[in-house]
UniProtKB/Swiss-Prot annotation:
It comes from Pithecopus azureus. It is found in: Secreted. The modification Lysine amide is found at residue 11. Its main location: secreted. This is Hyposin-H2. Keywords: Amidation, Secreted. One of its GO terms (cellular component) is extracellular region. The keyword Transmembrane does not apply. Belongs to the frog skin active peptide (FSAP) family. Hyposin subfamily.
Length: 11
């Protein structure tokens, strides 16, 4: 689980 709100491109 990654912070999508911090890095939306990482998704």
């Amino acid at each position: 689980l990654r912070p999508a709100f911090i890095r939306p491109k990482g998704k």
